[in-house]
Amino acid sequence: MTKSLLSLAVTAFILGGCSLIPDYQAPEAPVAAQWPQGPAYSPTQSADVAAAEQGWRQFFHDPALQQLIQTSLVNNRDLRVAALNLDAYRAQYRIQRADLFPAVSATGSGSRQRVPANMSQTGESGITSQYSATLGVSAYELDLFGRVRSLTEQALETYLSSEQARRSTQIALVASVANAYYTWQADQALFKLTEETLKTYEESYNLTRRSNEVGVASALDVSQARTAVEGARVKYSQYQRLVAQDVNSLTVLLGTGIPADLAKPLELDADQLAEVPAGLPSDILQRRPDIQEAEHLLKAANANIGAARAAFFPSISLTANAGSLSPDMGHLFSGGQGTWLFQPQINLPIFNAGSLKASLDYSKIQKDINVAKYEKTIQTAFQEVSDGLAARKTFEEQLQAQRDLVQANQDYYRLAERRYRIGIDSNLTFLDAQRNLFSAQQALIGDRLSQLTSEVNLYKALGGGWYEQTGQANQQASVETPKG
């Protein structure tokens, strides 16, 4: 009987080679072969290390930011959920993969029963006993048309997509922490600037008020000076609030409070980031985890079509066991007590009111939906990189122009202050110079923040943020298929 069971298993594996999964072909990328060109774009440069392979410790120069990113990778809850989802999909794949193999189980049972005389065939009451021990396979499906293999393939692709989703979550987290940190730094700089400007306005207001008391300045001059003071106080409260909210945002991203031993930050206008190469549009197909995730989900939908097709064909399941049966426990394994069971079952769909056809149509529609999602993901990635490349050059020019504007306003302010104090110009000219300088300085900080966040977003768009150190891509093995 053991040989019969073995032969049955071998036959099942041979017959299980058929698959109805459609041949998979990746859709054409619906984007241009080159990045956009024009006055807003810098010429793309090649590099030995792609942006996706550049470690975030080499990309971000600020030691405080590096410390915060490391903290977030340990404590962030979104990243923890993504890792747990990966474990869950791995377990689901292993569960589905187990259906490819017969589930062998051993069973032992025993019973004793008293039969009354009026129910006994002999007319006498008695006690009957029965003991059994069997080893067998229960309801094993012969995968003749690849239904189980299709479902296993679908579970595998879903698991692989969850691995890419975890990568996307980490890349997004690294960029989010960096952007939140730079926003915090910029708001602190704006708060400090406003604090200093408010003191200057208050000094000017007090000076104008004293001048009014001796008849030098008019009531209008006093009112204008007070307006500047109150406007600065509004900004002071605004930036004070923003700094506190920035800390709260960082705390959520970190999953814990900002470390008390946080390293000394770099100045906002220091060399904060390494420049990353754009490469070619085709590179992001292999390096963006969200694109890889979308393709794995497309492959999973393609595998589901195979399972839906297989449902049209007969399914055969086998139940078989062998063992011993005896009325006496002591003779259960004695010669002549052997027993066996072989019970095949076939299920042939005849009428189902069109549900199988509807299931197949649904699986094909789901594949078409995933094709559209895959193409949309590629288009979004292309746009994000293109936007980042346009921002790189234009922000450099804009920032330099804004620095020149600040310098011009500083010169204007010094001249206006000198002329006001010696009585050549009115207080109105001096206040105008103060406001212009304050506005230009605020804009400079805002432009620097926009430039930094744009570069961070470009690094993210190119797939950067997964590796801690440059060179890890060559050391880290690709994701392995989990074993059953």
Curated annotation (Swiss-Prot):
Keyword Lipoprotein set for record: yes
Residues with lipidation of kind S-diacylglycerol cysteine: C18
Pfam families given in the database record? OEP (PF02321)
Please provide, alphabetically and separated by semicolons, the GO molecular function terms listed in this UniProt record: efflux transmembrane transporter activity
Q: Main location per UniProt?
A: membrane
Q: Does the keyword Amino-acid biosynthesis apply?
A: no
Keywords from UniProt, A to Z, are: Antibiotic resistance, Cell outer membrane, Lipoprotein, Membrane, Palmitate, Signal, Transmembrane, Transmembrane beta strand, Transport
Q: Which family does it belong to?
A: Belongs to the outer membrane factor (OMF) (TC 1.B.17) family.
PANTHER family according to UniProt = CATION EFFLUX SYSTEM PROTEIN CUSC (PTHR30203:SF32), OUTER MEMBRANE CATION EFFLUX PROTEIN (PTHR30203)
Q: What induces it?
A: The arpABC operon was not seen to be induced by carbenicillin, chloramphenicol, erythromycin nor by hexane, toluene or p-xylene.
One Gene Ontology term from the biological process aspect of the record: response to antibiotic
The entry's cellular-component GO terms read:
cell outer membrane
Which residues carry the N-palmitoyl cysteine lipidation?
A: C18
Q: What is this protein called?
A: Antibiotic efflux pump outer membrane protein ArpC
Q: Where in the cell is it found?
A: Cell outer membrane
Signal peptide bounds: 1-17
Lineage of the native species? Answer: Bacteria, Pseudomonadati, Pseudomonadota, Gammaproteobacteria, Pseudomonadales
Tell me how this protein sits in the membrane.
Answer: Lipid-anchor
Question: Which organism does this record belong to?
Answer: Pseudomonas putida
Q: What does this protein do?
A: The outer membrane component of an antibiotic efflux pump. Confers resistance to numerous structurally unrelated antibiotics such as carbenicillin, chloramphenicol, erythromycin, novobiocin, streptomycin and tetracycline. Is not involved in organic solvent efflux.
The protein's matches in SUPFAM superfamilies, at most eight in alphabetical order, are given as: Outer membrane efflux proteins (OEP)
